[in-house]
Amino acid sequence: LAAETLGASVTQTSGSGGAISEWELLTEKRTGLNLWKVYGFNQSSNISIVDPASGEQLTDMDIDVVLALVSVLTDRTGLSLDELEQALATHFVAGFQGGLRISQRDQCKTSKMRVPAESSVLDEILDRLHRFTRLLRKLPDWSIAQLSKAIASCGGLESEETENEDREEVLINLAIIKRL
């Protein structure tokens, strides 16, 4: 019922070769290749893409460098610069109170701006960002601030101990709030 309320598909055949449901994308932590795939990448190194903002050819880059670029993140998430800033400022996405601020924000070009995190910390942020963004799309009448507050009120702030079942419970509670 929660998946239906949120408009998230639930695929009956999952597993190693099966399709991934929207419910799984919202509830399961993604790392490594599974995380890169949600952002449209199939490898973690030797990445060559055209920067979506500047048109510059980026070659032989590692995934953490590519996905730390604000121009790539806004393109891959569909968020505007302002929306990305708001999402990174949330406790849920950043992983701590006060959130993150984009580095080199004073630049006029998103291709020069970066998410100020590296390696495993960046991976954690990117995992929560993709789930937050997907959930935001499922709740189009909610602002980023409203979704952030609702997640916090449902106990959705994540830690090392957070399991997929905990994330499912948060989504069930969010579906209840939506129905009110």
What are the roles of these predicted feature ranges?
Residues L1-L180:
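Hydrophobic/aromatic interaction determinants used to assemble and anchor large protein complexes
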